[in-house]
Curated annotation (Swiss-Prot):
Protein name per Swiss-Prot or TrEMBL: Uncharacterized protein TK2179
NCBIfam families reported for this sequence: thylakoid_BtpA (TIGR00259)
InterPro entries: BtpA, RibuloseP-bd_barrel
Family: Belongs to the BtpA family.
Cross-referenced CDD domains: TIM_phosphate_binding
Naturally occurring in which organism (per UniProt): Thermococcus kodakarensis (strain ATCC BAA-918 / JCM 12380 / KOD1)
Alphabetical list of Pfam families matching this protein: BtpA
Length: 261
């Protein structure tokens, strides 16, 4: 992925998958909705898409086998349908499953919520999986990149942000770092984002809260943007991706790229 152009990465938030509490028994409709969103993102001009088991609340720390298999099927369908770079995130913190799926479907990157350190979450205490993931990458070598959160959203963190950031990169071996607001759709703290950019030897990606209104300000400090909530119909995360809203954000990004040349 070309971080020189500050890519827009659009979220494909999946409906509840088999193996999750809210699954309604209709897997075909899950796949169809995911493909519609992925195609819309490609048509709008997004630079990449990322698929995530967003609907699987309440999340376990690690996904069960049914969920992993189902997510792989959806990811492969998206891989076959669109030509954009593809990412995988398995909530709440199953980077091993995410990498395995990405390897199987030839995806390009994964997101890991807690690669290093400890997060206090609604799933309990989640510990980093950097060692386990590094060993899997060694066994299954590929070009798949690891995007790792620092002080991930929907969690409480007691350590220093700068220390956690550097640990994630230097000891966790993240290929890029993700900085988010406190929750899905909530904007990132610009001061924290600026600090991340100042100290980071790897790309810094905004992981939540990017909108048409704040993109110009965030553009100064970020190398990429994971966008979900704002590009949905009416700006509501549970809705489908809106072609109009997604195109509007893409056009703004084009203007910002041009102005920075």
């Amino acid at each position: 992925m070309d971080f020189e152009r500050k890519p827009l990465i659009g979220m494909v938030h999946l409906k509840p998958l088999p193996g999750s509490y809210l699954y309604n028994g209709d897997f075909d409709s899950v796949i169809e909705a995911a493909l519609r969103d992925a195609v819309t993102l490609e048509e709008a001009g997004f630079d990449a898409v990322m698929v995530e088991n967003f609907g699987d609340v309440p999340f376990p720390k690690y996904a069960d086998k049914t969920t992993v298999a189902s997510l792989a099927v959806v990811a492969k369908a998206i891989r076959d349908e669109v030509s954009l770079p593809l990412g995988v995130n398995v909530l709440r913190n199953d980077g091993i499953a995410a990498y395995s799926i990405a390897y199987a479907v030839k995806a390009d990157f994964i997101r890991v919520n807690v690669l290093s350190g400890v997060a206090y979450t609604d799933q309990g205490i989640i510990e980093g999986i950097a060692h386990e993931l590094a060993m899997l990458r060694k066994r299954l070598p590929s070009e798949i990149k690891v995007f790792a959160d620092v002080h991930v959203k929907h969690a409480v963190h007691f350590g220093d942000f700068e220390d956690a950031f550097l640990d994630t990169v230097e000891r966790g071996l993240a290929d890029a770092v993700v900085v988010s607001g406190k929750a899905t759709g909530r904007p990132v703290d610009v001061d924290k984002l600026a600090l991340a950019k100042e100290i980071s030897p790897v790309p810094v990606i905004v992981g939540s809260g990017t909108s048409y209104d704040n993109l110009p300000e965030l553009w100064k400090y970020a190398d990429g943007f994971i966008v979900g909530t704002w590009i949905k119909r009416d700006g509501r995360v549970e809705n489908e991706v809106s072609l109009e809203r997604a195109r509007k954000l893409v056009e703004l990004a084009k203007e910002l790229r041009q102005s920075s040349i």
